[in-house]
Amino acid sequence: MSDEDADEYDDQSSISSVSDDDDFSGSESESYQDTTESTGPSEATTDEMLWGRRRAPVCGIAAQAVRRQILMNQQHEPNVLGNNKKVYQTFGSTPQLANERHKEMYSQIRRGDDSSFRSRDRFVPPRRPRMGYGSSDLSAIEEMSPIRSSTYSSSSEAHRLSSLRAQTEWKPQLTSTTTSFQPLSPMNHHDKENGPFKAPMSPVCSSTPRSQRMYRKNPKYRRQFGSSLQLSESRLEESTSQESERAVTPESWMEHNNENEHPDQMMFAKPKQGSFPRPEAFGLDNAYAKHKDIRGIIFLSMSLCGRRLTLNVQNAAYFCSAARPTSVCSYVSAVLCHRPSSQSSSSSRQYRQRPDECYRTRLVTNCNSPSFDESFYFTFSENCVRDLLIVTVYEMDSNNAEKKRILGCMTFPVSRILKKASQVVGDPFPHYRRQDPMEDVEINNEGFFLLNKDQGRKQNFPQRKVRRQTFYEDPAFTGVSSAGSSVISNNTGGQMTMASPRLSVPNELTMGDYYRSTGSSDMRGRSTNNLLDYTSASSSTNGSAGGPEKLKLHRATLPSITTTTSENNSDDAKSLSPEQSPTDHHFLCPDDNGGVYGAGPAHSAIKKSSVRRAASFTFSPKHSSSKTNLRQLNGREEDKEKKRFLGPISRTLSYLRSKMDLALSTSSLYPSRDDVRQWEISFESLLNNKFGCALFRQFLKKEFSDENMDFWLECEEFKKMKDGKKSTTQKAIEIYSEFVAEHSPKEVNLDSDTRAATKAAVEAGCKPDTFALAQSRVEQLMSKDSYRRFLRDRLFLDLLESYEITDKEDKPSSSKDKN
């Protein structure tokens, strides 16, 4: 057939094709094998109507079915289409190249007269835009949009080019708008030969510099497809030729949707390095934490409900540096250690045999900031005042569970927990009956630093105890004016103007809490500007330097306005400046030592050697002293003589004197020789003497049983109160709640009958003899147990030996006087 005839037939024919979605059955395929039996026009295409009934199908699944059927029938029936007509198959079973695969749109079947049909290069597949005339490679161009419907399935076509939409090399920087890729719907049908369909991996919101910088952060991340899309014909041909050689990542579409994540997060999902807790984050200085060996902090909360303590272990943070980035496997242990009282009784022996209550949390592995969030419950007994609650944090080796070490610990005395509960409630805790409902009382809810083993067994370090000192709280910075004016702190040879600020004097207005609490004598560089202006009626200091009048830095001491002036001493005139008139007080500045009175306790501690203190205005002759001074000197001599006789226990006596009533005279405070000897004989004489009670209480404090002496003294004071008053009833309730009630902060050792009788007496009505029975029981207990050990203690023996030494010294002196 000539070319002109081919063009003529091309213009007249109406070309149509088989749809990709058509489902060809086996009956339709058989109609193409033997076309002599088919009569309906629906069994053949338009080209078969034009060229004849023996024309093969054009393309699609029908063409594939015909080819397979021809190959199967070629062995048995080689002449299917007739005796004089032979079929020639030009295709083979070996795969063709990718650039030539698209050219074979249908099977090239020769006719009986050996004339071949025309080439169908311009035949366009269905559902694809017709590209017109031009290069044959342009027929493979598909839709350029990166979004593809989920209903489209690529399984309907065989050996076709994979779409450019399936390439993960597509980058959003080629578009002019911000792009967000979200899967429209999961694709359930995939072609296993071509690999699963994947959307391009890119951030949710991206732009050109952002995406380039993002992929450049991690050099280990390598994209599967390095070439980018270029809108040019040559680049398109190159990408289509290399499409079959690219590898597809075998990752399922239905897995975790990680297309909006950063490539570093998708491929290298490891814990972040460098985010380690530091002491500065919790207000603690790093140097101090290293010096005290503080390795972390743990957050605890405690609440008390009657006899039940709830300990909640919240979370912790372990301090470590970047040089040691290892994670910690840790757990927390809480132990309630029972410590019986020093009194040897049957109840204390039973309490000593009681086992400790121990709890521990779960093990948190490889974490420097673990979160435990576990609660433990402890029940306090009657003799729990001396018990200790110890919280310990252990670090365990991940490979060997037997290897562990203490990261830190802390100790909470039960007596202090009960004391805090009483402070929160307002009354001594617990002041409830067992049948009354009780609410939870919050004791602690804060962080506690992990101390080492030695310090943690004795105390705890809460986070609120850290003193955060800033630059404006430092005394070195408070002496400089914020307005930029200078403050004179040294006696230099310069001059100051009339309106210049003076040296500040510490008083109630200018002195803060820091200076009231300190007794330092050096106030230079610490004092703040005085709020009083001595040159005008206003109380503000003027920072402007103006005025021609000058005053030299000579300070004059003003006399006190509280003293009566009779006649001035000759020494007072020397304190004034010789260049100025003594009556010109307009430019005089008050001295630090005596100018302003009533400046607080720190005023008397200020001393300066450069300024002379003013003399007294009342004249008195030399070598004259008042009667008051004589009495003071005589009292001091008597005190020295008493201390010399007492010998090595003078410090103890001084301490006891400071604790006792200061109004007592010296003779009533220090015991005589007969009193000390009487203490050794009778326990009642020891209790009836105030010094003896103080000394005996000091001994009981060493044995942790001073609550017995405190209860005895409170009962003695209660006997002196009047009956029937409200204060008497309130005092009785306080004594019962503090000493007699069960689980009280200072519970004394009483039997159950005595405790019940005392409780009934308090409820019946407060009388002077309400605590008589309990007081007698405690007195008997002290006389049989503590008093005997007191007589053998070094505190009493030193006092007794001191009087014996003085007796030996007095005997030789008395014999000399007789001679």
From Swiss-Prot:
Biased composition (Basic residues): 213-223
Domain C2 as annotated: residue spans: 290-429
Regions of compositional bias (Low complexity) in chain numbering: 149-166
Ranges of compositional bias, category Basic and acidic residues: 112-124, 234-259
Keywords: Signal transduction inhibitor
Domain RGS: 682-800
Domain of life of the native organism: Eukaryota
Molecular-function annotations in GO: GTPase activator activity
Pfam families, alphabetized: C2 (PF00168), RGS (PF00615)
Disordered as annotated region, ranges: 1-51, 112-135, 149-259, 515-594, 617-640
Record-level GO BP terms: negative regulation of signal transduction
Ranges annotated as biased composition (Polar residues): 32-44, 173-185, 517-533, 559-568, 617-632
Bias type Acidic residues, positions: 1-11
InterPro entries from the UniProt entry: C2_dom (IPR000008), C2_domain_sf (IPR035892), RGS (IPR016137), RGS_sf (IPR036305), RGS_subdomain_2 (IPR044926)
Listed GO CC annotations: cell cortex
Description of how the protein assembles with itself and partners: Interacts with egl-30.
Protein purpose: Inhibits signal transduction by increasing the GTPase activity of G protein alpha subunit egl-30 (G-alpha(q)), thereby driving it into its inactive GDP-bound form. May organize egl-30 into a stable multiprotein signaling complex, and thereby persistently inhibit egl-30 when triggered by calcium or phospholipids.
Domain notes: The C2 and the RGS domains are both required for its inhibitory effect on G-protein signaling.
Protein name: Regulator of G-protein signaling rgs-7
Organism: Caenorhabditis elegans
